[in-house]
From Swiss-Prot:
Active site: D604 (proton acceptor)
Cellular localisation: Cytoplasm, Cytoskeleton, Microtubule organizing center, Centrosome; Cytoplasm, Cytoskeleton, Spindle
Superkingdom to which the source organism belongs: Eukaryota
Organism: Caenorhabditis elegans
UniProt feature, compositional bias: Low complexity: 89-99, 434-454
Feature: compositional bias, Pro residues: 15-24
InterPro entries to which the protein is assigned, alphabetical: Doublecortin_dom, Doublecortin_dom_sf, Kinase-like_dom_sf, Prot_kinase_dom, Ser/Thr_kinase_AS
GO molecular function, one term: ATP binding
Domain Doublecortin: residue ranges: 211-298, 340-423
Record note on what altering G219E does: In or484; temperature sensitive mutant with oocyte spindle showing morphological defects including formation of multiple poles and fragmentation at 25 degrees Celsius
Name listed for the protein in its UniProt record: Serine/threonine-protein kinase zyg-8
Amino acid sequence: MPQTSAWQLNDTTARPPPPPPPPGSEAGGSDGASMNGANTLPRVSKRVSAAGKTSNIPRFKRPHLPHSTRPLSAVLTSSSSPVVHRKISPSSSAPSTSSAHRRFSHLPQQHFHHHIHHNQTAVISEETLTTPRASTLNLNQTSVFPTAISQGSMPNSGTNTAEASMTSSVCAMETEGTNGDELAESRDMVSEMQRRCRIGPSGYPHLLKAKRLRFYRNGDQYFKGIQYALQSDRVKSMQPLMEDLMKTVICDSTALPHGIRHIFTIDGAQRITSVDQFEDGGGYVCSSTDAFKPVDYSRAAEPSWRLTLANRYNRHLETKKLALSVVEPCHENTDFVFPRIIKVIRNGVKPRRISRHLLNKKTARSFDQVLRDLTFVVKLDSGAIRKLFTLSGRPVLSLQDFFRDDDVFVAYGGNEKMAADDLLVASEEHKSVGSGTSSNMRRTSRRSTMPNRNESLRHDRSGSVIPDQDQQRLPPLLDEKFQLVRLIGDGNTAVVYEVIDKTNNDDRKAMKVIARENVIGKEHLIEMELAILQKIDHTFIVQLYDHWFVDDSYYLSLELIEMGDLFEHLRIVRRVPERDAVRMMTCLGQALEYIHELGIVHRDVKLENLLIVKDEFGELGVKLADFGLAAEMPKDFGVLSTICGTPTYVAPEVLNKTGYGCKVDIWAAGVILYAILVGFPPFQSSDGSEQDLFSAIMSGEFSFPSPSWDDVSWSVRHLIMCLIHTDPFHRYSAGELLNDEWMVNLGDVDPEYEEWAHRFVQSKMHVEEEQETPYEYYTSRRTSMDELSESAAVEFSYSCES
């Protein structure tokens, strides 16, 4: 009877050699775990020290043997006695009476001539028992690797030797009377085990080839990418991979402000969710958000073609006179770069198109980059922009010229010549260019030309809308229904009148008029505002009653709020008590929670757009107004990218152009809460410069200076820090704002919570707060409202799609 084959998995990690099995144990294999083709993980056994104490620390010591003396990993023999495989090392000092020596001593010496010299005895050293072999597979069956053995040089055909894995040893014993079916079954089982254990013909595990990948930054067309070798046996999930990539140069603070949270294929067609999806040699894009920015990443590492110039002062030469050459990417000094908005006038027939472009550390890395970006934005008929001049006639020759006093430029193509008339701004263009441009084309003092109120950053919706006295009348269709009372407000895009509704018991309402000069080409923006206003109906949002489109102008009938806005109220009272601030923030929080649940972002939450109301008990509240910049979030869970808002209240993710969502309204709410408590905003600039203001906003660093904040609770300071957080993922939502301890308890929190908030705020503040001198305190109080009205709020109405 042929012996029954059995797979035995014996744990040999740091164990002494087992005693010889009793006769007949080959067939049963009762003391081993049955494999049945499964790739069972080995157990780590406890080892016994010399002192007899048990240790749970596994011994994984790999012997340092030269390649020529590596031991055999598997032995196939025709001996009738079972063979338990152990690594064999040439050691004359090992005892020859060991059990392993007795088992291998009967084999001919030439069987080991590749691994053991003829003058040495084949023994098993005790040191070799500490090899990283996890298990021993004993196969009592006929020749296991006939193909591999037949190709080797075996002096004795009766005994065949082959190498197996270093993590598992396979031994076979040929028996008489073995039929073909059992032999085929044994070979199938061994082949399956080979595949699962990755046993190669050399006896060592296959080294899994690492996948060579290249990773890019989302939206960064100038980053060449980095090479990364992905070893699937070491990195088995996406989280460790992202953490490893975060340690490399790819994690740029501007391109990836929130780290790596998503990885896309290079074309953006697929988001990678498993390491198995990576393909060798492929390119992938790392992103902080789920919005993929389509850029030709594969060409980022290629040299760029540009005009060969003898020096930087002949860029105005005609294109045909210049040759093309390949240049390496230039690394210009950008220490002077700060976030600012420039206006570029497209040369041509007046009135000319005026584009606005944001410059920051990301978009102004070199002069050539700015020219390429402006070419895409301005879209000259003659092609690329080759020349730029300020309104004073000074040519723009370097990157630093964009960050001087002038912020209005005229763009020309290669074949266009500058004329003196080109530098004169027409009356139709003057409003779009901004108040910084005067008739003599020189900017006057920034503080003397800034508006008295914060103006929003809007896109091509500016223009003079204040009508003459003779024109302050409604069209005949509306004149029959409404009677004009007085002008109560004006802005960039509209004027607001108080009217009497003749058809409804002489109710007083507000009439918002958007003049025709602001309608042409902007109908979709106004229609979006109307569509949003028709969707919403909330107690703390100004209600839209009706609207008309007459004589190319829009007329909106709105709820009238007679007490004015919070900005004017703060100019009078200077600061608001905490109890009143709680009620105002509750009104604002409920309004924001309502519109955010509808997927609507206001994008222009500020003091001027919060109208003061009183309830029947005389308590103050606010209503949210002016949805001129409001937008609906994309249905595919994307983000918005249009740069808009008011400088004092704009969130850092808007300036960084990384995409944003509803949390920009929460940031603005935090700025408002800070301002109403002490009378000045958290981010301000001493000289009204855009550089200081935007730098402070993007850093997110602010303080609670004394003595202005001495009488303000620590719990509300904690709330402000949760609202004004540079990371929108860690910033409060509208619901969290309403559920804050300070809000729920109407400013009267428990002493324990107040103490906890005190410790929290002090631990999180970036810089030690300095005590204000009496003069500094006086000037901060005296100019606090000037900061609100003038701090970087020059009418740089802009909006640019990324």
